Amino acid sequence: MYFCVFLEEKMSKKHDDSYSHVLKYTSLFGGVQVLSIMIGLVRNKAMALFLGAAGMGFNALLISMQNFASQCTNLGISFGAVPRLSELHEHQDDEKLHYYVQVVRLWSMIAAVLGLLFCVIVSPLMNQLSFTWGDHTLHYAMLALAVAMIAITGGETAIMKATRQLGRLAIAQIFTVIVSLIVSVPLYYYYSHSGVVPAIVLIAFATMLITLFYSYRTFPFRFDFHRSMLRDGASMIRLGVAFVLAAAIGSASEVAIRAYLNVVGSMDDVGLYNAAFMITITYAGLVFSAMETDYFPRLSGVANDYEATNSIVNKQIEVSLLLLAPMLVALMMVLPMLIPILFSNEFLPVVGMAQVAVLAMYFKVLTMPVSYITLARRLSLSFLLLESSYYVILVLAIVCCFQCWGLWGTGLAIVIAHVLENVLVMGYATWKYGYRITSAVLRYAAFQLTIGFGAFAVTMLCEGFLYWITEAALTIVSTAYSIHVLRQKTHLWERLRSKLRI
């Protein structure tokens, strides 16, 4: 509890756009992500013990339905509300800010009602499509409560992100993952399969209460409805819907990829592809998690200032690249040991695919901060077109590369798709927004990419002791370089010495 108070006090201090700020919040939310993953593993273990494979499948089916219903009805408010709120917060226009908070909350309630009605209406159909035994209509209908609460939570989360309540948001996320474990495990233990739906609903309820508690401390609830609120939320909904559509296109592309691998290859290929994809994306997500939470609101606040935008984007790329690059080299090195531990020896054929796919994350970390400029400027159509282009490229690349090189080719296809996305996004941002990449970014990228491709070459050419010693050396070099640069940029060593009284 004292840690949470300390964290809130530290994070409530005046924010800036320095390298230290980027490093602090990337580390903070990366840490929260690690905690979430660890607690998720404990929950999965509890489900495996108390529910068995069938119970885990039942839970996965219901969670999929919940996510589908949320995606169809939440109007993208958790994302679309951030740019306007950030802009008002940046300009310290408190009157308009409080008014727009009410707009967001009104539309969140509308989304909650839509989600509730959607679940209730489609529950008989979903029961017929997904089950051949028993009547689970009530289970699907009960998910309506969870979907409605998730919509309300999304609106409040957007408010906290945009108004830089990042310390409180981090605390809320920590409490949420802990409470989810405390709530779910006893229900699985005492009620087995019958506890699955109550666990989903109670976790959503606890998450909503925790988020509301912290959000209402800054923006207390007020009911002051005006018809203009519906109209003033239109731009938010346009951007939110574009974000939802892009996510839907992404989901459709993943379905198409897995269906293609199953038809042309086998179900084993689908499972192996899924395992490698999950490891790579989840691992890199430790760094990327801070972008939506901290970076996007900061960028939205200065979206119309070209100089400030360039500065924020380039600093985010630098810090994210320097943090992620050593992690990627280390991941490439340990994948032959990690995959059997996380899965089984049956998944060893996917090691090569995962190692080449790791290279894609270098280009993703260069692209992602730039792609947020379109969102920060609320250009919903441009965002949708850029995202759609990437998914089309990804599907086509996987179709071609799988035919030529099998499963390893799908990893290469992911790299090709990210390289082309980088060219497309960088080119568009340069032409449309006057974005200019700095020499520092190019210098750091050149060094870390050289190390990364060198590490990949080692995976192809070396075995045994030579493999491990060379990969370890490259990991040390990449880490030392990142620490050296971050120490210069953030005075990291001086701060550590002052904390440790060295």
Task: Tell where the protein language model's regions lie, with residue ranges.
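Membrane-proximal transmembrane or re-entrant/amphipathic helices at the cytosolic face
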Residues: M1-D16, F456-I502
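Alpha-helical transmembrane segments of multi-pass membrane transport and lipid-handling proteins
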Residues: Y2, F6, Q102-F131, M142, ...
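Interhelical loop/hinge segments that connect adjacent transmembrane helices in multipass membrane
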Residues: F3-V22, T211-E254, D294-S311, K432-A446, ...
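Membrane-water interface segments that mark the loop-to-transmembrane alpha-helix transition
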Residues: L23-S36, L62, Q71-P124, L138-H139, ...
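Transmembrane helical elements of multi-pass membrane transporters/channels
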Residues: Y25-N44, M56, T176, I200-T207, ...
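Helix-loop junctions and terminal segments of transmembrane helices
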Residues: L75-H91, A162, F219-P220, A276, ...
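Hydrophobic alpha-helical transmembrane segments
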Residues: T137, A141, A170-T218, S235-L239, ...
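Membrane-interface junctions at transmembrane-helix termini in multi-pass inner-membrane proteins
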Residues: A148-A172, V358-S389, A429-W431
